[in-house]
């Protein structure tokens, strides 16, 4: 799923024309948010991020059959808490990337009329609200979906996400050639 995630990010970078995240946000502020023209890329990236963060339904390393021999058995107290905190920080980072790449980052329609401190406060509030939504989505998916088996995960990655990510990249290239994006 890392390859699919990379191809989805390449679609965003191709449409934006820059590798800088603030340029990606500026492009979305002056155009439409990337999840609309690249909805397939958004779905691929979000699914790959869920798999990358090892959250349910992709938490195969923490499945009941793996708990006896897993690495969590050897740690307790603060070391075990550090593992859990790193998983949650991974969720926050992944959610921040989703917001920045596909949902306009800290921009929101109508914020151009603000200036000074009001713009800063509104930008932080918009980003934190979008971030909180995707963190809620992580929790909701964990509560709602059952765990995948290894063969299902491999099939999803190679036969589902990778072809969709390739289609998204071809779509973005075609849309750029036709001057639609």
Regions flagged by a language model, labelled:
Residues 1-181:
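Selective transmembrane helix interface/packing segments
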């Amino acid at each position: 799923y890392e390859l699919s995630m990379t191809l989805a990010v390449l679609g965003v970078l191709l449409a934006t024309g820059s590798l800088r995240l603030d340029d990606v946000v500026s492009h979305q502020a002056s155009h439409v948010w990337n999840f609309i023209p690249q909805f397939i890329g958004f779905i691929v990236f979000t699914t790959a991020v869920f798999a990358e963060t090892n959250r349910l339904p992709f938490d195969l390393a923490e499945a009941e059959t793996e708990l006896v021999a897993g690495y969590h058995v050897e740690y307790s107290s603060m070391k075990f808490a550090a593992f859990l905190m790193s998983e949650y920080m991974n969720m926050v980072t992944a959610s921040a990337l989703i917001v920045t790449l596909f949902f306009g980052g800290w921009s929101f329609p109508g914020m151009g009329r603000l200036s000074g401190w009001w713009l800063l406060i509104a930008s932080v509030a918009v980003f934190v609200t979008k971030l909180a939504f995707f963190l809620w989505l992580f929790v909701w998916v964990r509560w709602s979906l059952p765990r995948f088996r290894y063969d299902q995960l491999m099939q999803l990655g190679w036969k589902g996400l990778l072809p969709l990510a390739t289609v998204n990249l071809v779509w973005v290239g075609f849309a750029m050639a036709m001057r639609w994006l």
